[in-house]
Each structure stands twice: as structure tokens, then as C-alpha cells.
């Protein structure tokens, strides 16, 4: 797979997305990045501590046990007791301006996730996701979790979860 990345920029913030080993990784979300994309990617690459992996590990935005993530997975469910562990791979990457649409596919679980990111001129990031079952049988979805890294400076999160667009403001 060729290296795919996208830089979404606003005067107050930037979002740098990169496909690493088939997973979508948020390399940077915070202060504006300047210069070329290659320099930015090189500058934000984490260092490797002694007695650690040989290369930095990036579990990706889709938290999955198949990629070594030990917490709650992004997609929790099963297909009649099977396909309970997913491994989504980026199958389509579309970037135009400050909009990115990424399609993830797990052919074993027969699921597809489309996640879009939009960064407006004020630096507000909007993320949307849809999950599609393209298999013949039913898929029992227990939970789908959106995940975004928060910068150290963050003191509040704003969540418009659910269909009724209720406002939920949480102190971090």
C-alpha cells in the first residue's frame, strides 16, 4: 500500500492523518503545522525508549485487539459468536481541502466503516462515522466508540452524541 496522508489546516489548528500499516493514525492534532508535510511528519515522530519496540507503535484510530490495543475496542459485536475481533484496513482515502473521507474494510467480519473529518476555518474538527454490514447474515453490534486524542492543554470536551443533538459538556 502506498503511503497516504492528509494535512487539514486552519489558522488556529492542524490535523495530520497518516495511514500506517493499513491503520489510520492521527499523527498530530493541535497547534498549526507549517512547512512541508514530510518535515512535519519527521518532526512529530516519537522517539523510542530503551527496551521498547524497534519502531514506534501506532494502534490507529480504530482501536482493535488485532493491532495490540488492550482497552475497549472501537467496534464491539459479533456475527453469531464469530467475527468478534475486527481488523479494519484502510480501503479508500479521499482528501480534498479540509475534508477527508476514509473507508475501512474488514472482509472477515464483513463490515465497513466510513469516517469523515472536516476542519473549519475556526479550527473546529467535526468527525462522522457510519458502520455498514455487507455480510449475508446479521451482525450484533454491542458498541461503537469514536476516539480522538486530546491535547494536553484541553480542559473541556464538547460532545453532540446521539440523534437528538443534545449538548454534553464535560470537564477533563
Go through the PLM ranges and name each one:
Residues 20-21:
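Contiguous, structured surface segment used for ligand recognition
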Residues 4-7, 13-15, 25-172:
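Polysaccharide-binding surfaces and accessory modules of carbohydrate-active proteins
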Amino acid at each position: 500500500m502506498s503511503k497516504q496522508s492528509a494535512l487539514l489546516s486552519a489558522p488556529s489548528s492542524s490535523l495530520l492523518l497518516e495511514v500506517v500499516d493499513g491503520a489510520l493514525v492521527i499523527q498530530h492534532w493541535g497547534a498549526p503545522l507549517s512547512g512541508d508535510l514530510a518535515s512535519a511528519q519527521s518532526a512529530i515522530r516519537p522517539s523510542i525508549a530503551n527496551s521498547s519496540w524497534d519502531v514506534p507503535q501506532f494502534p490507529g484510530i480504530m482501536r482493535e485487539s488485532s493491532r495490540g490495543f488492550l482497552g475497549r475496542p472501537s467496534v464491539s459485536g459479533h456475527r453469531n459468536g464469530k467475527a468478534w475481533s475486527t481488523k479494519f484496513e484502510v480501503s479508500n482515502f479521499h482528501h480534498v481541502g479540509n475534508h477527508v473521507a476514509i473507508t475501512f474494510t474488514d472482509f472477515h467480519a464483513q463490515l465497513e466503516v466510513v469516517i469523515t473529518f472536516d476542519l473549519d476555518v475556526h479550527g473546529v474538527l467535526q468527525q462522522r462515522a457510519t458502520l455498514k454490514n455487507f455480510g449475508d447474515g446479521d451482525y450484533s453490534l454491542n458498541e461503537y466508540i469514536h476516539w480522538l486524542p486530546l491535547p494536553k492543554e484541553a480542559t473541556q470536551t464538547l460532545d453532540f452524541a446521539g440523534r437528538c443533538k443534545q449538548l454534553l459538556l464535560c470537564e477533563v
